[in-house]
């Protein structure tokens, strides 16, 4: 079990899905969020769900990161700032998007095997690009994140470009498959069922 807290981001708009993807049934669980939470709870001592609407997840006995400080902004920047504010004693956070259900323990172990040291972040990268919502973020990014919010800039790629980042190269693109559209959801359901 890892002592670094894990933040499961489940507060996105889900505009491409047409409904809240965090609440879609997944595998044998009531929701994708429950599936992710229970999996991550076997790897990390503390798992938090980041959302503006914790009442939507009352089917999960979980702790939440309250993202209500900016009710009209649906962006991970808000989740990061809220998490750093709520978890004052933590020097770093492991983050994962709710819509990446195939990130496994072996992959998480690869992040944990690296010393954060002077890095601002340790982020997953595949051949298709970087995956900002899969990795470790240092508290050193808290002030830059606040500044981004003040400037109404929510592009994590830009933050990472201006930071000291170690990228973990992941060969298998499928591990970072996102569930953003109805087609991707159906594909993920088949994959998790072993079809």
Model-derived segments and their meaning:
Residues 1-141, 146-153, 158-175, 183, ...:
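Nucleotide and nucleotide-moiety/phosphate-recognizing core
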Residues 180:
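Active-site rim beta-loop-alpha module in soluble metabolic enzymes
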